[in-house]
Regions:
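N-terminal helix-turn-helix DNA-binding module of bacterial transcription factors
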Residues: 1-59, 73, 338
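Alpha-helical recognition/docking segments in bacterial nutrient-uptake
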Residues: 2-5, 57-171
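Short beta-strand segments enriched in small/hydrophobic residues
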Residues: 17-19, 54-70, 172, 180-189
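Hinge/beta->alpha junction and helix N-cap segments in small-molecule ligand-binding domains
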Residues: 67-76, 94-102, 158-168, 184-233, ...
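Periplasmic-binding protein-like
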Residues: 115-123, 182-185, 220, 241-251, ...
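Short acidic capping loops at alpha-helix termini that bridge into adjacent secondary structure
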Residues: 180, 214-218, 269-274
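Flexible loop/turn connectors
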Residues: 234-339
Length: 339
C-alpha cells in the first residue's frame, strides 16, 4: 500500500505539501494540488481508514486541530499522527486554524455539530483552554503545549520543556561569546504553557541569570511561526538594533526567514550575525548555512499523543502530562562574534 512518503517521492513535492493537499489546506498552489491528486489517484493511496479525503470534520472521527497555517513543525507532527491513526484504523479529520484563532471554541462547535470521538490539539492557547475546554467531555490531547495544572481530567499533554530548552539555546550563544542577543518569534504572551511565552521568558531568564541586560522593547520582535513573519520581524529588529550579534528565533521557520532578512541587509551568517532556531525541522538541515537549532522529536510527540488518546478512548483513565527530551544540534549558523 502506498504511503504519504511514496506520494511525496512520486510527485516531487515535500511531505508537508502532500499533507496540505490531503487535508484540503488552502495554502497550496494549483499546480502542486493537481500533480499530487494525480499521483494519489494512480497509486490508490488511502489517506485514512475510510479510503477517502476528508474535507471537513466527520462524525465519530478523531479530530486534529492545527494552530497555525504555516507552521512546518506542527505539519510534520500532523503527518506522523495521521499515519499512526491510519495504522490503528481510525478515521481522522483535520481543521487548520489561524495562529490567533480560538481553537477551543472551534472544538466546542464541532462537539455540537459532528460529535467527534476525541481531539488532538496541535498547539493551543492556555487562555482559551481555561475559558472553554470544561464543556468538552471526550478525551483530548494537547501536543506541543503544556496542560499540566489546568485541571482537566480528559486533557493530556506532551511537549518539550520550552522554558528550559530556550535557556539552553541562549546559554549556547553566551558560551560562544555573544552578549548582544536579539529574540524573534511568538506574540509576546505572558501566559505559562504557551509555547511562544515559555521560550521567550526562558531566554530572558537565562540572560538575567548571566547578568546580561536585555532591553525587551529594543531587542525583541514578535512574529507568527512562519518564514514570512520571521523575515519581516527580523528585519525590523536588525534595523532597529544593529549592534545585535546573535538572534534566537523561537522556531526554525522564523529562523529561516531571519537569515534571509540578514542576507538582504548585507549581513553574512555567521560572520556578521549568528542565528539559532528551535524545533529541528527537516529544512533546517538544508538551509545555507545549515541552521543550529534546538531539536525536539516530532516522532516521539506523535507516538506518545496517539498512544495516550487511543488508550483513554478504550480504557478510561486520568490524563497524563509528559515532557520529551531536547538537544542542541550544531549547524553552521553560529560562531564567535567579531571583536
Amino acid at each position: 500500500m502506498a504511503t504519504i512518503k511514496d506520494i511525496a517521492r512520486l510527485s516531487g513535492y515535500s511531505i508537508g505539501t502532500v499533507s496540505r493537499v490531503i487535508n484540503s489546506h488552502p495554502d497550496v498552489s494549483e499546480a502542486a494540488k493537481r500533480k499530487i491528486e494525480e499521483v494519489i489517484r494512480k497509486t490508490g493511496f488511502q489517506p485514512n481508514s475510510n479510503a477517502k479525503l476528508l474535507k471537513q470534520a466527520s462524525t465519530s472521527a478523531i479530530t486534529i486541530l492545527v494552530k497555525g497555517t504555516k507552521n512546518i513543525f506542527l505539519e510534520t507532527i500532523l503527518e506522523e499522527i495521521q499515519e499512526l491513526l491510519r495504522i490503528h484504523g481510525e478515521a481522522v479529520s483535520v481543521v487548520f486554524l489561524d495562529e490567533l484563532a480560538d481553537e477551543v471554541e472551534t472544538a466546542v462547535q464541532l462537539c455540537a455539530e459532528r460529535k467527534p470521538k476525541g481531539f488532538i490539539f496541535l498547539g493551543a492557547n492556555p487562555d482559551y483552554l481555561k475559558k472553554s475546554f470544561g464543556v468538552i467531555t471526550v478525551p483530548a490531547v494537547l501536543v506541543s503545549g503544556d496542560a499540566d495544572g489546568l485541571g482537566f481530567e480528559n486533557l493530556s499533554s506532551f511537549c518539550t520543556d520550552d522554558f528550559a530548552a530556550a535557556k539552553e539555546a541562549v546559554g549556547y550563544l553566551l558560551s560562544k561569546g555573544h552578549t548582544k542577543i536579539g529574540i524573534v518569534g511568538g506574540m509576546g504572551e505572558r501566559e505559562h504553557g504557551n509555547v511562544g511565552a515559555d521560550r521567550l521568558y526562558g531566554a530572558m531568564e537565562k540572560l538575567k541569570e548571566s547578568g546580561i541586560s536585555f532591553e525587551r522593547e529594543r531587542c525583541y520582535e514578535p512574529a507568527k511561526f512562519s518564514a514570512e513573519a520571521g523575515y519581516d520581524s527580523a528585519r525590523r529588529l536588525l534595523e532597529r538594533a544593529p549592534e545585535i550579534t546573535a538572534v534566537f528565533a523561537l522556531s526554525d521557520t522564523v529562523a529561516i526567514g531571519a537569515m534571509r532578512a540578514a542576507k538582504d541587509l548585507g549581513l553574512s551568517i555567521p560572520d556578521d550575525l549568528s542565528v539559532i532556531g528551535f524545533d529541528g525541522i527537516e529544512y533546517s538541515r538544508y538551509s545555507v548555512p545549515r541552521l543550529t537549532t534546538v531539536e525536539q522529536s516530532s516522532s516521539l510527540l506523535a507516538q506518545r499523543s496517539v498512544e495516550d488518546l487511543l488508550l483513554r478512548l478504550n480504557y478510561p483513565r486520568p490524563a497524563v502530562h509528559e515532557k520529551i527530551p531536547f538537544r542542541i544540534v550544531e549547524g553552521e549558523s553560529v560562531k564567535k562574534p567579531k571583536k
